[in-house]
Amino acid sequence: LYDIGSGCLLDTSEFDMTHEPTVQESVAAGVDLTFFSCDKLLGGPQAGVILGKKELISRLADHPLARAVRIDKLNLTALASTLIHYVKGEALTQIPIWRMISAPIEELKARVFRWHQSLTASSEIIQGYSTIGGGSLPGQTMPTWLLAIPGNGNKYSAAEIAKRLRRSDYPVIARIESDLSLIHISEP
């Protein structure tokens, strides 16, 4: 039995990150049953997969609890759609987590610059880091460019700015550091 956690299908070391065990490595190693999440680095719906030897999967499917924990049709469709992107070699362009991870640093800077130009509030562009996620690659960070809105240069504190951003018609989540509301522009 092997719980690989994130359900990663791509080699994270190709993106200057710590190597995360992949589903393919587990299967190639002959593990009887591999468990992994469908969200996180896989980029699909929140669900779990048990992958393994046919006779063991059959025994699990026959268990009375199998019906209670099986995936529903909507999540199964979402998972299938996600996996199709991997099969077609489109994961880096079609799956948001991989689009964010693989975005060139220059592209991130250009996005932040566009936001910076459109703001009426005092802001600056600074270098920083982004975390990948708590459940996948814990503690792993990547260099990025951030839009920094200072609390002391505006009418509100950084915490108040972050609160207003979260409650806006198009919510934006900011990280607060040193009285700055930091915004990572990960999607165009």
Name the predicted role of every residue range.
Residues 52, 149-153, 186:
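Short beta-strand-to-loop capping motifs
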Residues 1-86, 120:
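Conserved PLP-enzyme active-site core in the AAT-like
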Residues 75-76, 80-133:
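Conserved PLP-dependent catalytic core of the aminotransferase class-I/II
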Residues 118-178:
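Catalytic-core signal marking the mid-to-C-terminal active-site face
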Residues 181-188:
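Residue-level detector of conserved catalytic or cofactor/ligand-binding positions
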Residues 5-6, 55-61, 87-97, 139-143, ...:
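Short acidic (Asp/Glu) and glycine-rich catalytic loops that position anionic groups and cofactors
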Residues 16-19, 53, 68, 72-76, ...:
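Generic structural signal for well-ordered, non-membrane alpha-helical segments
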